[in-house]
């Protein structure tokens, strides 16, 4: 029997709660944009100081990711800092491809994607509105599971169509997260047989996490 290996590389405590709070303060999202019907919209910003902090922590990890994914790193995109206000709903997305003529077509030079949670999930009545969120789960449709936002945790995964993802509706609070992408020297092809355990990912893939 093959030893299970997760295609999700998870690093808890990548940033401290205090560092997450500082980034949220720097983003200066005050009032959400709305659509024509008054529904709040996801907003994106770039913030140079916060990007420098994240990349200073991330760059030493690149050799580990190269080995883990059997991938040769070429470069990293700018970080998009995302704000999902209460009531916001979004559509599923693929990080590097679009659905064209009934098939996925790669349209972006992205091979590995990263999402860093800056907010903390909480479904209990004792709720800290400054940094906690109810809703905002990061769902991966092909694997039928979701990650609860845990501030300071970094989720790394391949960018292709096997990893279509979405953020569930924000029921209470505001969700903040950072999203960025890595490009390889050659296009990365996700091969499921190199990541055994998809028959029961919650049991097989997440027994041990990276701190």
Locate each region found by the language model:
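Fe(II)/2-oxoglutarate oxygenase catalytic core
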Residues: 1-154, 162-211
